[in-house]
Regions:
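Predominantly a Rossmann-like dinucleotide-binding segment in NAD(P)-dependent oxidoreductases
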Residues: 1-43, 166
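Active-site rim elements
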Residues: 3-6, 37-38, 116-120, 140-142
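Hydrophobic alpha-helical segments typical of transmembrane helices
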Residues: 14-17, 128-132
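NAD(P)-dinucleotide binding in Rossmann-like oxidoreductases
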Residues: 41-46, 56-128, 145
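Short beta-strand scaffold segments in enzyme catalytic cores
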Residues: 51-53
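C-terminal helix-rich "cap/oligomerization" subdomain common to oxidoreductases
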Residues: 56, 131-167
Length: 167
């Protein structure tokens, strides 16, 4: 069996989110790597990948994706996102607040006023999924434009094809 690779599989979400959060319509790949650390019985499998991108506005992005969830983690996958700005940063903990709280959906941020934490579980919702479903059915572009989706797909394919195999 074959598949598109880990960068197209789960990395595509990180690339799309980078374009959205940074306000970029385009980016270029700086570096990408993939590896197979724990599945030697499946030589074509990739259980690790990482990518570095630079957006057209100079915003930079690094992400790592893997299929290496430890058995002791209370959920499948970690799902953290870090957004670093010039005056602070935000950390999104989507699925678990590791070793602290069994609830999901925590936002941490640091700015000139201090350190902050907000439990947003049950407060924010998931409007994107409903909007995307309606976009597919109604041929609208509410969740994202087709151009945005295709650019994210193009960037993940380029990252996958150009990735160095490190293991």
């Amino acid at each position: 069996e074959t598949y598109s690779g880990i960068l197209c599989d789960i990395g595509s979400h990180q690339i799309e989110q980078f374009l959205y959060y940074s306000g970029c319509d385009n980016a270029r790949g700086v570096n990408s790597q993939v590896g197979n650390y724990c599945h030697s019985q499946y030589p074509e499998m990739e259980d690790f990948g990482e990518v570095s991108l630079v957006g057209e506005n100079g915003a930079s992005n690094y992400f790592r994706v893997d299929w290496l969830t430890p058995d002791g983690l209370s959920t499948w996958g970690d799902g953290r996102t870090f957004i670093l700005g010039t005056k602070g940063y935000i950390e999104l903990r989507k699925y678990v607040d590791v070793a602290r709280d069994q609830t999901k959906d925590h936002v941490y941020w640091v700015d000139e006023k201090g350190e902050h934490r907000e439990d947003v579980s049950g407060k924010v919702g998931y409007p994107f999924f409903q909007e995307l479903l309606h976009d597919c059915i109604d041929r609208t572009e509410t969740a994202m434009t087709q151009e945005h989706a295709l650019k994210a797909g193009e960037l993940c394919v380029i990252a996958q094809i150009s990735a160095q195999k490190i293991k």
